[in-house]
């Protein structure tokens, strides 16, 4: 596994807590997706399971390190329920069985829960009992992608570690070294993905990037012809919800431009479109457009029986009126 540069400091900080015997037995890592948190946990675990660690580094040569590198260490336990994608009481029973058995390599044991929000209420209650007073040398790593909704008692039983986003400049340097896109494209992808560098890389290398560009190209042509219905086939094809999000992000950028906040634009590769909306329409009309698109998105995502093409047609006709392409 390769390091991500923004994980080096968090790794060393947590390892040093273990070196000083100050580490909590349960670390709850608060982060967002696209940060490589699994690698962070894996490297920390490899150090904990290393038989001959060298300072903050694992030796990468002992039997424990070789087992980790082969993803076959008997004392590394990732708890995943593949049946229904949730952690229920049965999942916690598996944990309970693991922690009260002697470590097969005679040292530490690692319990990794990749997403605590998949825990059912009964599973949380069962886990709380385990975390209250677990056997020695059992180390729990829990990942949380939505801290606001997390069980308060579960938070209190863990050491909370917030994994910070890397600086934008640092992420851009990493993206530059890991793909062939230009700086403006990388910056746009990074901001679309809430500054998560790995998500930005995956997005810009996927078909979604081309779909986004095609949507804006089609929108530009339809604006020129004052006929927004031309983008209907593009919207209906696939990823409709995501495409509505892209339209809203573009409109938000126009609002920011009207407030002279150009440094915070998301769609840095669509300045021409942003300028069209910001110069042609005030924020009242832009906000009205965003609200109508948001309502359309909500209906599409919550009403399974809806005729999506008909709804989008209605939305585009309404948007034409808002933008004064047709008279009401």
From Swiss-Prot:
Disulfide bridge partners, by residue number: none
Question: Entry's InterPro entries?
Answer: DNA_pol3_clamp-load_cplx_C (IPR008921), DNA_pol_III_delta_C (IPR015199), DNA_Rep/Repair_Clamp_Loader (IPR050238), P-loop_NTPase (IPR027417)
Q: What is its EC number?
A: 2.7.7.7
Presence of keyword Transferase: yes
The protein's assembly and partners: DNA polymerase III contains a core (composed of alpha, epsilon and theta chains) that associates with a tau subunit. This core dimerizes to form the POLIII' complex. PolIII' associates with the gamma complex (composed of gamma, delta, delta', psi and chi chains) and with the beta chain to form the complete DNA polymerase III complex.
What GO terms fall under cellular component here?
A: DNA polymerase III complex
Task: Name any Gene Ontology BP term.
Answer: DNA-templated DNA replication
Specify the protein name.
Answer: DNA polymerase III subunit delta'
Q: Which GO terms describe its molecular function?
A: DNA binding; DNA-directed DNA polymerase activity
Name the Pfam families for this protein: DNA_pol3_delta2, DNApol3-delta_C
What is the role of the protein in this entry? DNA polymerase III is a complex, multichain enzyme responsible for most of the replicative synthesis in bacteria. This DNA polymerase also exhibits 3' to 5' exonuclease activity.
UniProt catalytic activity: DNA(n) + a 2'-deoxyribonucleoside 5'-triphosphate = DNA(n+1) + diphosphate
Q: What class of enzyme is it?
A: transferase
Q: What is the lineage of its organism?
A: Bacteria, Pseudomonadati, Pseudomonadota, Gammaproteobacteria, Enterobacterales
Keywords for this protein:
DNA replication, DNA-directed DNA polymerase, Nucleotidyltransferase, Transferase
